[in-house]
Design a protein with these regions (language model features):
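A SIS-like phosphosugar-recognition module
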Residues: 1-136
Length: 136
């Protein structure tokens, strides 16, 4: 079941399950090599010496370090993971990634003997919903 996570906040919320839970998932990362805008951290807490090292650090660099650390932790425990590297976010590269992921869902459906296109398993809920909505 796909679950999305963006950045280190979402990643942190799910890392415990990924690292110590069942080994029944493939964790997928998307790394963007070139970004149009760079956000730079400004240290508002100059009186805290341990935070001085983060002044001037780009958010992009921090996210790449978080991705690499998470990837290394997963690998150290034999957890399946994949990293998709896009040169930049644009229609061409995003389209390629989405096409690849759509094909992988179709392929996985075939391997698991699940109809990924017709989705007959959804029909029961749709029929119940239709009946309930007609009684409103």
């Amino acid at each position: 079941t796909p679950v999305s996570a963006v950045g280190s906040t979402d990643m942190h919320a799910q890392t415990q399950q990924h690292q110590d839970g069942k080994k029944d998932k493939v964790i997928q990362f998307v790394e963007i090599l070139e970004r149009e805008q760079q956000i730079v951290l400004n240290n508002s807490f100059t009186h805290i010496s341990s935070l001085k090292k983060y002044d001037g650090l780009s958010v992009d660099h921090a996210l790449k370090i978080a991705l690499a650390a998470n990837e290394e932790a997963l690998n150290s425990d034999g957890r399946l993971n994949a990293k998709y590297i896009l040169p930049r976010i644009d229609e061409y590269y995003l389209g390629q990634l989405l096409y690849f992921l759509m094909l992988s869902v179709a392929y996985e459906g075939e391997l698991a003997d699940v109809d990924a296109y017709d989705q007959p398993g959804v029909e029961t809920y749709k029929q119940i919903m239709k009946q309930k909505m007609s009684h409103q």
